[in-house]
Amino acid sequence: MLGGDNQFQYAPNPVEWVDSLGLRGFRNAQGRFRGSLNIGEEMSSLPSFSNKTPGQIRSSLRGRGYTSSVAHSGGEIWIKHLPDGNTSAVRLDPRMVRNPPKGFADEVPHIHKESVPTNKVQNGNYKGKDAIQYNDLGCPSNKGSNPNHARDVHIPMQPTRGLYG
């Protein structure tokens, strides 16, 4: 079999092509690591939080410069203001209790990754209509174009005792 270009490969270099965990970081003109400058960089570099415990999520966000406050949902909201005038937000929501359960995505403890213009944030909170929602990979999602929107933006957390049990 002769060598050559593989037209069916999924990436030019599968070892270096994708940085899904955001470990690469960003570098400035001098080659030093820097933080995200805009919402696209921040959302795409957030790690996957699916099935992580609230403690693991908090630790990761704290290390990235996020601050927390109480969310309107009764959970927590972690925010980080960015130089482009946007705020990155990660909401930790307790499960919604329904009797009988309807099988909705919010019936388990979950998180949301969202962005909102910084001028719309008050005391760490904002209105849902002002937010753009993202899936766990950091890609924007909306009801109009994604039939799996509700499931994609309700990222399940590992249940724990207390509020997120």
Show which residues each predicted segment covers.
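Short turn/helix-capping motifs enriched in Asx and small/polar residues
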Residues: 1-30, 165
